[in-house]
Design a protein with these regions (language model features):
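Hydrophobic structural segments
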Residues: 1-205
Length: 205
């Protein structure tokens, strides 16, 4: 039954089915080799009636999912990454252990879509480019398949571009270096992306 109005609806998807559906949007093979994506916690066969979407899986978002009656938490950043911090024990005297145990005890599955969603067509960086109003967008050569490049509708001085970024993206803060020239060609990359600065500069961004 539909939880809103009690009317009949189609079959309820399982966590495993939702993982496969999300991988159709952001294929697993687009993820960086060090990344950890997909259904990271939970029962593949668990029926999912309600899901909560968050940037991170934290104690707070896990508690919010439980309170909302959501059986699934879909997040961008991986709840665990064996390349960064291998999980060797599952104990309640570590922050990560407490979080994973909280998810298991609450019956909350966790699907994480990270660099594969950054790189996917229509994913994070395409969304950033659209939000900034970039035109003629393309994947930046040398940008790891993640970074997007495009043109502003018109050239603008750096202060005006910074104001546009503040208005459209509402960041907590902005770090910038004044190159002494107006802005037209822009590269966007969610996350660090520092290793792609040289490629962006070479492309005229």
């Amino acid at each position: 039954k539909n939880w809103r109005n009690g009317k009949e609806r189609g079959p309820v998807p399982t966590a495993g089915e939702l993982e496969r559906a999300l991988f159709q949007l952001a294929p697993r093979d687009l993820a960086e080799s060090w990344d950890n994506v997909g259904l990271l916690v939970g029962d593949c066969g668990r029926e999912i009636h309600r899901a909560l979407i968050a940037l991170d899986v934290t104690a707070g978002t896990a508690a919010e999912a439980k309170e909302a009656g959501a059986e699934l938490l879909v997040a961008h950043h991986p709840v665990m990454n064996c390349n960064w911090s291998p999980v060797q024990t599952l104990r309640d005297d570590s922050q990560q252990g407490r979080l994973l145990l909280q998810l298991v005890r609450d019956g909350t599955a966790a699907i994480c879509m990270h660099t594969n969603l950054d790189a996917a067509q229509g994913g994070v960086n395409d969304a950033l480019a659209r939000r900034l109003g970039l035109e003629q967008t393309a994947v930046l050569e040398g940008g790891g398949g993640i970074v997007r490049m495009g043109l502003l509708p018109e050239e603008m001085p750096l202060p005006a571009f910074l104001a546009l970024v503040r208005e459209r993206l509402r960041p907590n803060g902005i770090r910038f270096a004044d190159g002494g020239r107006p802005v037209r060609r822009v590269a966007v990359g969610g996350g660090a992306c520092g290793e792609y600065f040289a490629a962006a500069a070479a492309a005229g961004c």
